[in-house]
């Protein structure tokens, strides 16, 4: 009865007037997050499913827009001919932020299928990223017999709320500070591994002067980046514009892991799993004046964890 109720609203996908579902269906799931709940219905938009044959050659694709996906309760019937396939699933690539290579049936190999961030000619990106998701399934046999296969997604986008505050609560000038996040993660391969060789420079997609609830003046910059890997070269820099000096050059990934915190219901997880599950961070930096006129940042907070910075991270 539950199956009939579910699929009675999905005839627009099945084109089958029978109440009994048939065929191979893909259930889009996103439980690989810090809350350990399925958030596909609220976080995943469009889905692109790429099918490859047993020789890893491209066969066909299915693009499912957000409305269609959610009307179908994140269930998609796979329309490919009866055969065994390797499936590569990307979520969030329907716009112009992400680029796939030209796909040719029978020619394009799965290992050559990298997705790239559409940066400007300086390899910079200053917009809010569309949430990007990845999944892959091996040896999936399509048939007319009813079956449901789950595709568990990994989220590849990370968002940072960077707050700059004077330690004496003095006002700051927004134009005096420039934030930059750099990482060689602007190209991701079919295994969801960043393979870029040129650093992508992520600039704030929003930066403003603001007041905290205690009426303390701050500079609030919002940045984002693609997938972060343990041991990678992702850095966050803050430049003091009047002097031209970089006052912070932070190996970001290791500091995110210093503040690793997650609910007990997830169990013990690796550093990489934490980086993949967590997608939102608040970074607070406390400015300290100096006799040279160039401020310093000796202390920061990562998601409420206070960290004292080493001189090597304080720029030059």
Regions found by a protein language model. Give the residues of each.
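Short, low-hydrophobicity acidic/polar segments
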Residues: 59-155
């Amino acid at each position: 009865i539950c199956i009939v109720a579910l699929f009675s609203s999905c005839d627009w996908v099945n084109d089958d007037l029978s109440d009994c579902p048939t065929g191979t269906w893909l259930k889009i799931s996103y439980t690989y997050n810090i809350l350990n709940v399925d958030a596909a219905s609220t976080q995943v938009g469009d889905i692109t499913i790429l099918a490859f044959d047993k020789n890893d050659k491209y066969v066909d694709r299915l693009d499912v827009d957000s409305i269609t996906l959610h009307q179908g309760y994140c269930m998609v019937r796979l329309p490919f001919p009866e055969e065994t396939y390797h499936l590569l699933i990307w979520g969030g690539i329907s716009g112009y932020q992400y680029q796939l290579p030209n796909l040719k049936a029978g020619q394009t190999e799965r290992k050559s299928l990298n997705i790239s961030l559409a940066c400007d000619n300086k390899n910079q990106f200053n917009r809010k990223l569309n949430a990007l998701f990845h999944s892959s399934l091996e040896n999936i046999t399509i048939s007319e017999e009813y079956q449901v296969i789950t595709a568990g997604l990994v989220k590849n986008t990370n968002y940072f709320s960077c707050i700059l505050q004077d330690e004496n609560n003095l006002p700051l000038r927004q134009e005096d500070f420039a934030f930059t996040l750099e990482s060689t993660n602007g190209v991701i391969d079919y295994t969801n591994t960043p393979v870029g060789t040129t650093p992508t420079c992520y600039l704030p997609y929003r930066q403003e002067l603001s007041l905290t609830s205690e009426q303390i003046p701050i500079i609030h910059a919002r940045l984002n980046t693609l997938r972060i890997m343990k041991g990678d070269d992702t850095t966050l820099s803050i430049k003091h514009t009047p002097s031209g000096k970089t006052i912070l050059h932070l190996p970001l990934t290791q500091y995110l892991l210093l503040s690793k915190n997650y609910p007990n219901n997830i169990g013990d997880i690796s550093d990489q799993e934490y980086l993949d599950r967590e997608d939102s961070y608040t970074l607070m930096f406390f400015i300290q004046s100096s006799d040279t006129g160039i401020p310093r940042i000796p202390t920061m907070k990562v998601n409420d964890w206070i960290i004292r910075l080493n001189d090597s991270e304080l720029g030059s």
